[in-house]
Amino acid sequence: MSVHIYSPPPTDPNEAERERAVVDTGALQARDDAKLEAICKEACRKVRGTSSLLSVLYGDTQYVIAAYGFQAGAYSRKNSLSGHALAAGNEIFIIPDLSSDERFAENPWINGENARFRFYAASLVRPYGRLPIGVLSVLDEKMRTTFSEPERRIVISAAEDAAARIVQISQERNMSPVPSPPPRS
C-alpha cells in the first residue's frame, strides 16, 4: 500500500444547496445518454485530448455520467480533479502540468497508480444557469504549455451543451403523458 500526499478538493460553502440542485435536475439518472457521450467525444476530439468526462459531484462521490476515453462510473471525490475545478468556481479551470502542481502531483490519477494524466481543463456545468452540479473536463496524457482561447471556448461550450442536455432529460422525465380520452360506448 502506498501513501500519497496531495490536496483533496475543498467543499463549497453552499454545498447543501448545490447538492439539492443535483437532485432537482436528476443529473445522476442521466447516465448512458448517447447525446452526453457525444458531447464528451466531440470536446475531446476538438482539443486533441485523450479523455473527456462529464462529472457530477454529490456527497463524497464524483459520478462520471458520460465519458470518452475513460470509464464512466462512481469515483472517490477525495481524488477528484473535478472537485478542485468545481471549488474554484471559474468558468474555465486549467492545469497545464498536473505532475508539477503540488495539489495533484501524488494523486493516483496523475502518478500512474490509476492513470498518468498530465493536462486538465474543465468548465462548470450549470443547468438552468444556476449552481454548478459538476464539470465537463478534457484530460491529456501530455502536459501542455498552451491552451488557446478557441480551445477554452470549446470546453466552455461543451459544458453549456451538457447542461442544456441535462435540463432536457430532466424535463422529458418530468413530463407525464397526456391520458387518452376514455373509449366511447
What is the meaning of each model-derived region?
Residues 1-80, 150, 157, 165-185:
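Intrinsically disordered, low-complexity terminal regulatory regions
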Residues 118-127:
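A short, aliphatic-rich beta-strand micro-motif
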Residues 136-145:
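Short beta-strand-to-loop transition segments that serve as allosteric relay/switch motifs
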